[in-house]
A protein has these predicted regions:
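A surface-exposed, charged beta-strand/loop segment in the N-terminal or early-internal portion
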Residues: 1-35, 322
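Acidic, carboxylate-rich catalytic segments that either coordinate divalent cations
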Residues: 275-322
Length: 322
């Protein structure tokens, strides 16, 4: 009875501290071997969950891997604020239409940007008027229905992350990249991913972040921070999912190696964990901690959590020796 009371007290204490990741102190006290064991469990859980998400998209895409990649690409480029809007855009402008217009970059840009419904929010210069005219023709050709502008979140968005600018970057990536699936499966390092996505936009966007608003000329290539996020949330996830699909352990290992050789994400959640010490050094570490945060801490699932169970086991042993 006393042991049960002690167990309950430990669990209640863990749950009370879950919202501010109180078990970070325990993680920081572990040696590298034991912390790696925990990260491996959590990291694989996250990869498997994302694998299931990708396979659901694969089914939605009629078992078409290039279309699946295209949907995950747009979803990832949308970031936290606009991932659902970008995913819907990928449904409305299918990859097959992109391939058919591959030799005409401005047509691809017209389809993607025109289908957002966002052009109506901005003044029209000659370039934007041409995009609109092209979209009217291409939307009839491919039966594309534009989204509502209200589906997009534009407030508190940095200029570099504006949906229209991101779509101009996606356009040049799709135009310049042949055999897309092969190229992403080949990536082994963060530099490989940077080279793959670091293509310059069409000239108009060098002096624009949004339509018709002229700025000084600045390169709009995807930067290293964004390319690392693409490596983490797109490239490695597709490598792991496709490797699982074709039962290629080497491809799954490539995904893991890439995660281990990219720096950890920088966000408020990881910063909170790192306040206990350098808990996230690589992207694999930070992905493991995100799994811990959102699947366990957020829902107070301490009894089911690998960290919570170890703390409970340690506390139980200490009680028994008293």
């Amino acid at each position: 009875m006393e042991d049960m009371d002690a167990t309950k007290r430990v669990i209640n204490k863990l749950k009370a501290g879950a919202s501010y990741f109180a078990c970070g102190g325990y993680l920081s006290s572990l040696d590298k071997l034991h912390r790696t064991e925990i990260y491996n469990t959590l990291g694989f859980e996250r990869l498997e969950r994302k694998n299931r998400d990708i396979m659901r998209l694969y089914e939605e895409c009629d078992c078409n891997w290039p279309q699946t990649f295209y949907m995950v690409l747009l979803r990832t480029m949308g970031g936290i604020d606009n991932k659902e809007a970008f995913t819907e855009l990928a449904r409305r402008v299918p990859y097959a239409a992109i391939l058919r217009e591959k030799m005409a970059p401005q047509n691809i840009e017209a389809m993607l940007i025109g289908a957002t419904g966002l052009l109506e929010l901005y003044q029209h210069d000659e370039y934007i008027l041409n995009l609109k005219r092209n979209f009217e023709y291409l939307s009839a050709k491919y039966s594309i229905e534009a989204m509502e502008a209200s589906e997009w979140k534009l407030t508190h968005i940095y200029p570099n992350n504006h949906p229209i600018l991101r779509l101009s970057q996606i356009t040049t990536f799709l135009v310049h990249t042949n055999n897309v699936m092969d190229r992403i499966l080949e990536c082994r390092t963060g530099d490989d991913v940077q080279r793959l996505f670091g293509v310059e936009t069409l000239p108009y966007w060098l002096t624009h972040y949004t339509p018709a608003a002229v700025t000084r000329s600045v390169s709009k290539r995807i930067g290293r921070t964004k390319s690392d996020l693409l490596a983490i949330n797109l490239i490695t996830q597709m490598q792991f999912a496709y490797g699982s699909y074709i039962t290629s352990e080497s491809l799954r290992e490539r995904a893991l190696s890439l995660l281990e050789n990219i720096s950890a994400e920088k966000n408020s959640v990881i910063a909170q964990w790192n306040s206990f010490g350098p808990l996230a050094r690589s992207a694999f570490d930070s992905q493991a901690l995100l799994q811990l945060s959102f699947e366990y801490c957020k829902h107070h699932r301490c009894e089911e959590c690998i960290v919570g169970r170890r703390i409970l086991r340690q506390a139980t042993k200490a009680t028994q020796t008293e």
